Swiss-Prot record:
Enzyme Commission number(s) from the entry: 6.3.2.6
Species name: Shewanella oneidensis (strain ATCC 700550 / JCM 31522 / CIP 106686 / LMG 19005 / NCIMB 14063 / MR-1)
Keywords: ATP-binding, Ligase, Nucleotide-binding, Purine biosynthesis
SUPFAM superfamilies noted in UniProt: SAICAR synthase-like (SSF56104)
Pathway(s) of this molecule: Purine metabolism; IMP biosynthesis via de novo pathway; 5-amino-1-(5-phospho-D-ribosyl)imidazole-4-carboxamide from 5-amino-1-(5-phospho-D-ribosyl)imidazole-4-carboxylate: step 1/2
Biological process (GO), any one: 'de novo' IMP biosynthetic process
Protein name: Phosphoribosylaminoimidazole-succinocarboxamide synthase
Keyword Nuclease: no
Molecular function as annotated in GO: ATP binding; phosphoribosylaminoimidazolesuccinocarboxamide synthase activity
């Protein structure tokens, strides 16, 4: 099979039994199972959740998004070989480490295939929980233009690009478009402060105001666990985004859990430690791909200016990127995944066929 065949680019057309619409995100698709199938799997697989918990099959793709657009490569390459399996493997590793360190659970109940999670339905917190240990990216761009207050936090004078911050900072933004919150524009990814969340905690999905402290603790503790593990591999954990939600436990109590993915090259910046000590930035995350795009296209403002989205979408749609650029991203993702997990990342020749076979034979979910 060709390289393009080994890439799972379309992941919302699997014949999984469902009575709801398939939710397709930038990278993952979610298939909500029927109530009967959810109850059957909870019973037969022994999942530690209430018997009426809705379950979903979450299938990751190899698509690559940047600047809110999906990009593709030459030769019909619609994604990055190994990217989906690498992201899931990294998240699986960190979630296991979180459990070993006594942190919160995740939404994952089962891992049938490197591309597939079986997850429990959660009530999401509508906050992108962002943690920063170094000043770079959007924080540096704002700081270099003279801004000193970021998400309600006053930054000191004299900071330099890419330097370590005096302390770990929590700089949240909105998840999705939220309306009717005083002082918060109805736009996606708007920076917010802790005081914004406290004053409107229910609008952001928190059940109790005290849970704001818990979310910040889980964010910082999770960051520190990953940062320490990466430091042992001579990698620098620069910044990251976590997501949280509530589930109901066996006793009927709400509990806050980690959702989505954690500590991956898609949701984080990770730098090579040796290069950083030499004053260079060597990205082991999607940031390297973003920088490639900014240098590849003659007018980078199209990628940065939100007022030019139609041009940006056309740019992504009409331009196949060089194969070597796509393969460099593949090497970045699989390389950091193998460092983190200590295991090779599987690259199935036909992932879609493999997924269907497993979900049919071991879970009876294929129609």
């Amino acid at each position: 099979m060709s390289l393009a065949d080994s890439v799972l680019a379309v992941n919302n057309d699997l014949p999984i039994r469902t009575d709801k619409s398939v939710h397709s995100g930038k990278v993952r698709s979610v298939y909500w199972l029927t109530d009967a199938d959810s109850r059957r799997l909870i019973k037969t697989k022994g999942y530690n959740v209430p018997e009426d918990t809705p379950l979903a099959i979450m299938v990751i793709s190899d698509r690559i998004s940047a600047f809110d657009c999906i990009f593709h490569g030459e030769g019909g390459l619609k994604g990055i070989p190994g990217k989906g399996a690498a992201l899931n493997a990294i998240s699986n590793h960190w979630f296991k480490l979180f459990a070993e360190n006594g942190l919160a659970d995740s939404h994952i109940l089962d891992i049938p295939h490197p591309f597939v999670w079986i997850v429990q339905k959660a009530r999401p917190i509508k906050v992108e929980a962002i943690c920063r240990q170094y000043i770079t990216g959007s924080m540096w761009r704002a700081y270099s233009k003279g801004e000193r207050v970021f998400c309600g936090i006053t930054l000191p004078e004299g900071l330099e690009k890419d330097q370590k911050l005096p302390e770990l900072l929590i700089t949240p933004s909105t998840k999705g478009i939220l309306t009717g919150i005083p002082g918060v524009p109805a736009q996606d990814d708007v920076n917010i402060s802790r005081s914004d969340i406290e004053a409107n905690y229910q609008a952001f999905g928190f059940e109790k105001v005290e849970d704001i402290d818990l979310y910040e603790k889980l964010l910082k503790d999770g960051f520190k666990v990953i940062s320490k593990a990466l430091a042992d591999l001579d990698q620098v954990f620069v910044d990251t985004k976590f997501e949280f939600g509530y589930v109901t436990d066996q006793d009927g109590n709400s509990k806050l859990i980690y959702m989505d993915e954690v500590g991956t090259p898609d949701s984080s910046r990770i730098w090579d430690g040796a290069a950083y000590r030499d004053g260079k930035i060597l990205e082991n995350s999607k940031e390297g791909f973003r920088q490639f795009l900014l240098n590849h296209f003659p007018d980078p403002d199209i990628l940065l200016n939100k007022d030019r989205m139609p041009e940006r979408e056309a740019l992504a749609r009409d331009n196949a990127l060089p194969l070597e650029a796509m393969m460099q991203v593949s090497r970045t993702y699989t390389g950091i995944a193998e460092k983190v997990t200590g295991a090779a990342i599987p690259l199935p020749a036909n992932p879609k066929a493999d997924i269907i076979k497993i979900l049919r034979e071991e879970y009876d979910l294929i129609v």
